[in-house]
A protein has these predicted regions:
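Residue-level recognition of pore/gate-forming positions within transmembrane alpha-helices
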Residues: 2-5, 40, 53, 62, ...
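Alpha-helical transmembrane segments of multi-pass membrane transport and lipid-handling proteins
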Residues: 11, 38-91, 121-129
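Membrane-interfacial segments
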Residues: 23-26, 63-71, 131-135, 159-164
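Small-residue hotspots at the loop-to-helix junctions and early N-terminal turns
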Residues: 1-2, 6, 76-81, 138
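Membrane-interface helix-loop junctions in multi-pass transport and translocation proteins
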Residues: 106-107, 114-167
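Helix-loop junctions and terminal segments of transmembrane helices
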Residues: 4-42, 97-102
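Interfacial helix-capping/hinge residues at the ends of transmembrane alpha-helices
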Residues: 19-20, 61, 94-98, 124
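Helix-capping/transition residues at the boundaries of transmembrane alpha-helices
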Residues: 23, 101, 109, 127-129
Length: 167
């Protein structure tokens, strides 16, 4: 969680400053600039996140042993790798969410997104119920994040004319 929080803080510093420009360009009915900013921020945040997450994922066992010594809990390395991979998709979700805020039509998007988030708990429970390894709890979170991405794409397509293939 600490690794995830540190990287997410860095990525937030990329995404958050773009929000006023995206909202202003949408309010000015400049959809071309809105999408250009959204795509650029999505690509930049995802690239930076991936550039930090990949070496951490590769060397996670060394990092954990250096940080925690010999008392690294079982499954920790896989939990971290899955969360890093999950948050790579989160870098794509956040800029789409900004566009939805700019439209002012949040009800549909929030309904889809909230339903997706609520899905993670029963999905994780089912994974554990059928005897899956603990890492599958984090796979449930990954599925939720991908579902949130699709919820954002569907919403922006419906309310802001985003082409599915453009994103």
């Amino acid at each position: 969680n600490q690794v995830n929080s540190a990287i997410n803080g860095f990525i937030a510093n990329i995404i958050i400053p773009s929000r006023p420009q995206v909202i202003q360009s949408y309010a000015n009915d400049d959809l071309q600039r809105t999408w250009r900013l959204t795509f650029s921020v999505s690509k930049l945040a995802t690239l930076f996140f991936f550039m930090m997450a990949l070496p951490i994922s590769i060397e996670i066992n060394y990092i954990l042993n250096f940080w925690l010594g010999e008392s690294v809990p079982e499954h920790t390395s896989w939990f971290i790798v899955i969360m890093l991979f999950t948050n790579t998709f989160g870098c794509l979700v956040s800029p789409i969410s900004t566009v939805m805020h700019a439209t002012g039509k949040m009800k549909f998007y929030q309904s889809l997104s909230s339903a997706s988030n609520l899905l993670s708990v029963p999905l994780a429970y089912v994974f554990l119920l059928i005897g899956a390894i603990p890492e599958f709890v984090f796979v449930a979170l990954f599925i939720t994040m991908v579902t949130n991405l699709f919820a954002g794409l569907i919403s922006t397509h419906k309310y802001a004319n985003l082409s599915y293939w453009a994103y």
